[in-house]
């Protein structure tokens, strides 16, 4: 019997590219990957939609379809690259692009765009999307969803493990070795989002390559302490956040007109990410075990070095150790979530999101081949 194949799609809070992964399960194997750059104009529209200002409905509708088309084209490129027919794909799992994540209001909501109808129509492949809102409807945060996949992939009774996904926002998963204990996961706060935004504003570069610019600056201790005093960092899980909360306006408010050398701000923002993560790791009182890194931030050598220092005695590694490059783990996660949905299995963990119960997540947009 041929192995089942799924495709995972993600555009994270960093908005640098669309990540696509073609995955085979039982056992899990990545067949091919493809990163599709987001065109400048589309990225500009996405950034505008994801800020705290009011935006027009026509702009959102047009961007939704444009992003869906880009996702669909990225899938076709991936299939061509892998020399695989669309008929052999069970489903696509598409996270979309988050433009609002507001889990704590009177009527909590989260909104991801990247029209799955367009993806299914372009590719002919059944597409599963809108994974977060069912969890929210059950009283959960709708995020993070990755811990359920981390549990499937990395839980091990030989040691306690922490999985840190450093995207625009960083999220941490605790996988206890004790099978009687529940997995815990939450957003720790900013990952790359402030680093990238500050770099773009000051150097006109999308990101600080390997953290070299930050490494040349001096950490401003008083400012780090002020930033870490933000109430979110003291809030116990379940919790989740986004760039609606942690953005340049938040940073400027904390700077309060005080002037710093831009490179020192970059160094301080790396320290904010590293210390906020390390503080969360300490809460698990682990005197041994490992911290596994994934996401784009795993390529920031300066940040990784700070985590190694601050998170001792944990062994710090990356998901490369199990054969999955850190850049692709989240895309693989959404391929797995699509599989869970089509197999009528839950995709959330109430111990992570705070939902009343586990649930089958997502909506299904049928392709040309109806297997279910």
UniProtKB/Swiss-Prot annotation:
Any single biological process term in GO: amino sugar metabolic process
Summary of the function given for this chain in its UniProt record: Catalyzes the specific phosphorylation of 1,6-anhydro-N-acetylmuramic acid (anhMurNAc) with the simultaneous cleavage of the 1,6-anhydro ring, generating MurNAc-6-P. Is required for the utilization of anhMurNAc either imported from the medium or derived from its own cell wall murein, and thus plays a role in cell wall recycling.
Pfam assignment, any one: AnmK
Family, per entry: Belongs to the anhydro-N-acetylmuramic acid kinase family.
Record-listed E.C. numbers: 2.7.1.170
Keyword vocabulary terms for this entry: ATP-binding, Carbohydrate metabolism, Kinase, Nucleotide-binding, Transferase
Binding site for ATP: 12-19
Name of the gene: anmK
Pathway linked to the protein: Amino-sugar metabolism; 1,6-anhydro-N-acetylmuramate degradation; Cell wall biogenesis; peptidoglycan recycling
Name of this protein: Anhydro-N-acetylmuramic acid kinase
GO MF, one example: kinase activity
Principal EC category: transferase
Matching HAMAP family: AnhMurNAc_kinase (MF_01270)
Species annotation: Coxiella burnetii (strain RSA 493 / Nine Mile phase I)
CDD domains recorded: ASKHA_NBD_ANMK (cd24050)
InterPro entries named among the record's database cross-references: Anhydro_N_Ac-Mur_kinase, ATPase_NBD
Known catalytic reactions: 1,6-anhydro-N-acetyl-beta-muramate + ATP + H2O = N-acetyl-D-muramate 6-phosphate + ADP + H(+)
């Amino acid at each position: 019997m041929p192995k089942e194949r799924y495709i995972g799609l993600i555009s994270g809070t960093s908005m640098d590219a669309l990540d696509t992964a073609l995955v085979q399960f039982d056992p899990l194997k990545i067949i091919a990957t493809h990163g599709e750059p987001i065109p400048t104009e589309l990225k500009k529209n996405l950034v505008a939609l994801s800020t705290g200002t009011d935006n027009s409905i026509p702009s959102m509708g047009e961007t939704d379809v444009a992003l869906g088309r880009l996702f669909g084209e990225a899938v076709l490129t991936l299939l061509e690259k892998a020399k695989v027919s669309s008929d052999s794909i069970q489903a696509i799992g598409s996270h979309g692009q988050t433009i609002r994540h507001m889990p704590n209001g009177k009527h909590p909501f989260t909104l991801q765009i990247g029209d799955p109808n367009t993806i299914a129509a372009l590719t002919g492949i059944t597409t599963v999307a809108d994974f977060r809102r069912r969890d929210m409807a059950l009283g959960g945060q709708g995020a993070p969803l990755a811990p359920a996949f981390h549990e499937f992939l990395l839980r091990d009774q030989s040691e306690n493990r922490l999985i840190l996904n450093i995207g625009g926002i960083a999220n941490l998963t605790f996988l206890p070795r004790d099978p009687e204990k529940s997995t815990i996961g939450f957003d720790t706060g900013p990952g790359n989002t402030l680093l990238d935004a500050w770099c773009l504003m000051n150097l006109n570069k999308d990101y600080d390559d390997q953290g070299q610019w930050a490494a040349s600056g001096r950490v401003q201790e008083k400012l780090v302490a002020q930033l870490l005093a933000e109430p979110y960092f003291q809030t116990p899980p379940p919790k989740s956040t986004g760039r609606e909360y942690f953005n340049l306006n938040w940073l400027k408010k904390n700077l309060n007109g005080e002037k710093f050398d831009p490179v020192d701000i970059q160094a301080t923002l790396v320290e904010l990410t590293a210390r906020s993560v390390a503080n969360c790791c300490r809460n698990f009182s682990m005197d041994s075990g490992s911290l596994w890194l994934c996401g784009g931030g795993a390529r920031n050598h300066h940040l990784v070095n700070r985590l190694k220092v601050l998170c001792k005695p944990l062994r710090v590694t990356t998901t490369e150790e199990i054969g999955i490059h850190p850049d692709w783990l989240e895309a693989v996660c959404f391929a797995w979530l699509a599989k869970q949905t089509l197999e009528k299995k839950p995709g959330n963990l109430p111990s992570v999101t705070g939902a009343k119960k586990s649930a089958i997540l997502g909506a299904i947009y049928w392709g040309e081949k109806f297997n279910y």
